[in-house]
Amino acid sequence: MENPAFKRAIRSFVLRQGHLSAGQQRAMDEGMPKWGIEYRPETMDLEQVFGRAAPKILEIGFGMGGATAEIAAANPDNDYLGIEVHGPGVGNLCKLIAEKELTNLRLMRHDAVEVLDNMLADGSLDGVHIFFPDPWHKKRHNKRRLIQAPLVEKLAKKLKPGGYFHAATDWEDYAIQILEVLNGNADLENTADGYAPRPDYRPLTKFEARGIKLGHGVWDVIFRRK
């Protein structure tokens, strides 16, 4: 009999019902035909998708998309592919792309593990961002955490030599786990001695700034592909 816990572990998300506002639904209806990429189990040519040769950065789980849009706007020489399954976030980021007139950002609403397995070529990415993934803070739910060895192994294969993997979390025990998992991958090396300072390209969110004022920590982990 197949282990149901393993079936859960290979997905990159747990689907939660989120209510789309009318504006988010409209933005998604108008935006996804322009900026969305449909899931197909075949390798895509990222240069063809974006219409140019430029560094390609993948973000898994962009939430409401505010930081993603800000990063794309501040780094027009890079191309960004964001993956998120929850409708309100996808709709909100479509709205931000339109408002900021971004041309270097594309979206997918699909399970990131399937996209990695079937659509992204090995050595095709210059960077991967996973910012503030669900911490699943109850111990019995820790197995649902996204950043675990099987996913990191997949991501390492998709990175070019010298490409980077950047994770950030505000849960210390998850930060410890992330560091352990990444240290355990022979293809990756830490860019810092333990945790890294927040790079300029990752914007400080309002939530994060408020937490820092209250004395809460945020941990950035940045590794490079050997």
From Swiss-Prot:
The keyword DNA damage does not apply. SUPFAM superfamilies: S-adenosyl-L-methionine-dependent methyltransferases. It catalyses: guanosine(46) in tRNA + S-adenosyl-L-methionine = N(7)-methylguanosine(46) in tRNA + S-adenosyl-L-homocysteine. Residues 140-145 are annotated as: Interaction with RNA. S-adenosyl-L-methionine binds at residues 59, 84, 111, 134. Keywords: Methyltransferase, S-adenosyl-L-methionine, Transferase, tRNA processing. CDD domains: AdoMet_MTases. Substrate binds at residues 138, 170, 205-208. The active site is at residue 134. The keyword Flavoprotein does not apply. Belongs to the class I-like SAM-binding methyltransferase superfamily. TrmB family. Catalyzes the formation of N(7)-methylguanine at position 46 (m7G46) in tRNA. HAMAP family: tRNA_methyltr_TrmB. This is tRNA (guanine-N(7)-)-methyltransferase.
